[in-house]
């Protein structure tokens, strides 16, 4: 069964949390946008702005800490023959061994232009926020039209939700004021902009369960933002 509905007053009492996000745009993204770094930066900023908007109802501030663009080559295997799970595993290993050593952050998402799986546009570990290897997800930039930017933003927010302890919503049992909610198993009727009562309950449980109790999202981030152009890791502040 789903959790009860959460009143606005109850939501206002939820603790403030901060997620410092790094987005890694793979080489496929670099090629898709014809090497236009400004276009990629604009795309990612708009996506993160959407994600942050979705999470305000949970009292979570999502900020873009870094954008890394793999302009010359991918640093993990990202090809159509790769399985979705293998890509997630490889990205998590790379994050732990490389990215975390260069930049402190809470969660990283790989944004790819490659169709890794006909039925999957994103994948993440569950209840893994703050884990060095598993606080990751990947999502496909599967929408060609700017007007459909929300589709990709919802995908990224959905995968982040898994890291925060959320499971998929049960069909016809969970409610968010729309026909589909962000944690619905699939997007069939257009993207939803809200989390269900069930997702909110899973998240609240994740915060208090001793085995999880993610500490990294307690810290308010600095305002400084960087993007990094691979492979020499040249750093530009904005």
UniProtKB/Swiss-Prot annotation:
One of its GO terms (biological process) is proteolysis. Pfam families: Reprolysin (PF01421). Keywords: Calcium, Disulfide bond, Fibrinogenolytic toxin, Hemostasis impairing toxin, Hydrolase, Metal-binding, Metalloprotease, Protease, Secreted, Toxin, Zinc. The active site is at residue 159. InterPro entries: MetalloPept_cat_dom_sf (IPR024079), Peptidase_M12B (IPR001590), Reprolysin_adamalysin (IPR034027). CDD domains: ZnMc_adamalysin_II_like. It is found in: Secreted. Optimum pH is 8. Activity decreases rapidly at higher or lower pH. Its cofactor is Zn(2+). Optimum temperature for caseinolytic activity is 40 degrees Celsius. Activity decreases rapidly at higher or lower temperatures. No activity below 10 degrees Celsius or above 70 degrees Celsius. It is an enzyme of class 3 (hydrolase). Ca(2+) binds at residues 106, 216, 219. The keyword DNA repair does not apply. Disulfide bonds join 130-216, 174-181. GO terms for cellular component: extracellular region; plasma membrane. Its main location: secreted. Zn(2+) binds at residues 158, 162, 168. Belongs to the venom metalloproteinase (M12B) family. P-I subfamily. Monomer. Snake venom zinc metalloprotease that is weakly hemorrhagic and has Aalpha, Bbeta fibrinogenolytic activities. Cleaves the Aalpha chain of fibrinogen first, followed by the Bbeta chain and shows no effect on the gamma chain. Has caseinolytic activity. Induces dose-dependent edema. This is Snake venom metalloproteinase HF-1.
